């Protein structure tokens, strides 16, 4: 059995080998999650051109930490042979490309399973591996998936739809690749038979936008978009402005509505036909007093600082939070207590700061053990790990099929 590459053993996925081929965010985000949970993750990059994410000044140090960097042309014959040899010792392979791009270039699921019948293969693309030919081969990024899925049209303000930001479809799709690959791996361990997963980014976002779509599919009702960050249906829910910034709150519950009505001068409406006893939500449209409730809330909040508002809402057991700015995050006591922001060393020895590993495993925690590797940094070690000699590696490099760091 091939030994794993040198790395600390930690996390719930220690001993699992994951290989991914993909650039930017969606596919690599799946690899990032696996790597932070203890899997040995090998990142395949183009020999001539590194992953375009490397041009960003700081983000790659987060998104590519804990990885092993392999620079290999997997579509040329000798490079393809090395790739297939690597697949023999791989548990999960993730590729992100335009539709069935790998199959078109001869790397089908069946070819991969010839080399490893237990392999879990996750294909991540904008429109899926099959379907209408006018879509399946199209490139897709975050906004494309949001627009095509019905997700984008639900977001923004009543005057204009806006994409959810930053890069929501990429992260949702990457996490879908992570979870579905783990589900498949669990089944493989029971049956010994590999699995192929077809992840279409637009279908991921279709599912993420499902809540109000059901009203249309089953009743023909189109949900309006938010107005200045407020829930399109329920008053007292959403984004509100105070004297010194913004909060969000959710006025939900019998007691909560009764008490907030008293605070803002609407106690006389309680128990009326419009706001009967036991009301748990105030419908912005159906309740005749929905707009009055909103106006009174705006007036009440605008004349108070955030600290006073949050204190009172807490007393009323109304869920609420200040809208934190990025500079406020790392000094927040909850962030400090849970070490939500952390630091690690880059490969050049510099300190990098960013989000910590999530979620927090109690018995087998994740770990940050290395920064982003250089382009081709681990090619030599990976090829030796699967049985290549120094001479064979040099031949691949001389032919432009692999890149190593001397």
Swiss-Prot record:
NCBIfam families: PRK03525.1 (NF002914). It is found in: Cytoplasm. It comes from the Bacteria. This is L-carnitine CoA-transferase. Belongs to the CoA-transferase III family. CaiB subfamily. Homodimer. Transmembrane segments: none annotated.
């Amino acid at each position: 059995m091939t030994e794993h590459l040198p790395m600390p053993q930690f996390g719930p996925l220690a001993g699992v080998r994951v290989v991914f081929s993909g650039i930017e965010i969606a596919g690599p985000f799946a690899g990032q999650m696996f790597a932070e949970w203890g899997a040995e993750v090998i990142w395949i990059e183009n020999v001539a051109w590194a992953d375009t994410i490397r041009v960003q000044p700081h983000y790659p140090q987060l998104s590519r930490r804990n990885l092993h960097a392999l620079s290999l042309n997997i579509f040329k014959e000798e490079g393809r042979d090395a790739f297939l040899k690597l697949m023999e010792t791989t548990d999960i392979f993730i590729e992100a490309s335009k539709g069935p791009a790998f199959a078109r270039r001869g790397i089908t699921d069946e070819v991969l399973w010839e080399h490893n019948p237990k392999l879990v293969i996750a294909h991540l693309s904008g429109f899926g591996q099959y379907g209408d030919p006018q879509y399946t081969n199209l490139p897709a990024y975050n906004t494309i998936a949001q627009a095509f899925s019905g997700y984008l049209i639900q977001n923004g303000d009543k005057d204009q739809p806006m994409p959810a930001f930053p890069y929501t479809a990429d992260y949702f799709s990457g996490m879908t690749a992570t979870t579905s690959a783990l589900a498949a791996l669990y089944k493989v361990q029971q049956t010994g038979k590999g699995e192929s997963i077809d992840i279409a980014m637009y279908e991921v976002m279709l599912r993420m936008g499902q809540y109000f779509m059901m009203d249309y599919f089953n009743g023909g009702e189109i949900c309006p978009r938010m107005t200045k960050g407020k829930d399109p249906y329920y008053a007292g829910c959403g984004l509100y402005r105070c004297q010194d910034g913004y909060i969000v709150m959710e006025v939900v519950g019998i007691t909560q509505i009764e008490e907030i009505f008293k605070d803002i001068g609407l106690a006389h409406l309680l128990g009326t036909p419009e706001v009967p006893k036991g009301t748990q939500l105030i419908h912005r449209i159906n309740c005749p007093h929905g707009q009055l409730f909103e106006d009174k809330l705006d007036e009440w909040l605008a004349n108070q600082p955030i600290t006073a508002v949050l204190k009172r809402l807490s007393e009323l057991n109304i869920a609420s939070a200040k809208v934190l700015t990025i500079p406020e995050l790392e000094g927040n006591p909850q962030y400090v207590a849970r070490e939500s922001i952390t630091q690690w060393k880059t490969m050049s020895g510099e300190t990098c700061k960013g989000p910590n590993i999530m979620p927090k495993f109690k018995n087998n925690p994740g770990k940050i053990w290395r920064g982003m590797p250089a382009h081709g940094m681990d090619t030599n070690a990976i090829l030796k790990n699967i049985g290549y000699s120094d001479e064979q590696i040099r031949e691949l490099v001389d032919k432009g099929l692999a890149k190593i760091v001397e």
